[in-house]
Amino acid sequence: MKSKKIFKILTLLLPMITTFSCSFPKNKLNSNNVDTFYEQETNKSKQQLTNFSEDNFDETLEKLKKGNTIYFPFNNHQVNSKYAKNLNDLAQFLCHHSNQKIMIEGHTDSRGTNKYNMYLGQKRADSVKLYLESKGVSNQQITTVSYGSSKPVAHGNKENSYSKNRRSVIIYQ
């Protein structure tokens, strides 16, 4: 008898607890969180982006190639907001040129194991891909690859060298 009463009380309380817990706002995520960044950037108007036409395809592609490298902090795969304009322009270009394909390479510095660096390099490439897809780019246009620490652009054991190697590079195919 007592257990039936407890069960009834719990049956009544559980939906109330669930309702109240869902009605309170969740804690805001760190502004460096990649999901928050994607959400904020996706909400921006596409009208702000440059309009690309067939007339200036080569010229536009050359401009985009100049901003083809995204750098990352140590042990991090989140795209920094300072790359938003370049990535937004690239997304707009790819949306207007659906036959254009890109490959995103993920790279790391030499610190860490080979296995971890391959994983982190892939996460970096995937973060850039996810950002572009959030802007409407087809996943059929993007491939990713991780090179880990195997293709450094700077050699040395100082932060100056390390920071140049923590990157994703966009290759136009």
Swiss-Prot record:
Task: Please report the stretch or stretches of sequence annotated as the OmpA-like domain.
Answer: 59-173
Lipidation, kind S-diacylglycerol cysteine: residue numbers?
C22
A single Gene Ontology CC annotation of this entry is: cell outer membrane
Q: Name the domain of life this protein comes from.
A: Bacteria
Key word Lipoprotein present: yes
Choose any GO biological process term that the UniProt entry carries and state it.
Answer: cell division
- Location relative to the cell: Cell outer membrane
Keywords noted in UniProt: Cell outer membrane, Lipoprotein, Membrane, Palmitate, Signal
Give membrane topology per the record: Lipid-anchor
Lipid attachment points (N-palmitoyl cysteine)? C22
**Signal peptide positions (record):** 1-21
Matching Gene3D superfamilies? OmpA-like domain
Question: Which InterPro entries does this UniProt record tie to the protein?
Answer: Bact_OuterMem_StrucFunc, OMP_bac, OmpA-like, OMPA-like_CS, OmpA-like_sf, Pal
Against Pfam families, the record matches this protein to: OmpA
**Which family, according to UniProt?**
Belongs to the Pal lipoprotein family.
Task: Output this protein's name.
Answer: Peptidoglycan-associated lipoprotein
Annotated source species? Buchnera aphidicola subsp. Baizongia pistaciae (strain Bp)
